[in-house]
Amino acid sequence: MAGDTGRERKNNRETGSHYERVAGAYLEQEGYEILEYNYRCKTGEIDIIAKEAGYLVFCEVKYRTSDKKGHPAEAVNPAKQRAISKSALCYMTVNGIDEIPCRFDVVSIENHKVILYRNAFDYTG
């Protein structure tokens, strides 16, 4: 963010990583197999990549400490959905995956409450 110091960016990354691990633990309890955290490619980043019930699942993790900025899942707007979709395509291409159905889930964490939205949005290229 503009105006953030290096320390603030580091703290934000650490906080984000913490909540991604919380989300990952929750997903494992729900039967997901975590394949990767923080996948990065030229088109963007995916917080968690997992397998569940025969699907390759691309998960976006959103957290809030209060509702002042709205519900966490609301932050996954159409632009974010496109970026995640492109990154998912990149992951599948790089890894030679084309025969596995995939879906996009959102994990919302607000005040320590975890909510999973399966199939939260469709691929948007």
Listing of model-derived features with the role each one plays in the protein:
Residues 29, 39, 51-52, 97-98, ...:
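Positively charged, solvent-exposed patches that mediate nucleic-acid binding
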Residues 41-44:
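Short acidic/glycine-enriched loop/turn segments that link adjacent beta-strands
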Residues 65-85, 94:
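Mg2+/Mn2+-dependent nuclease catalytic core
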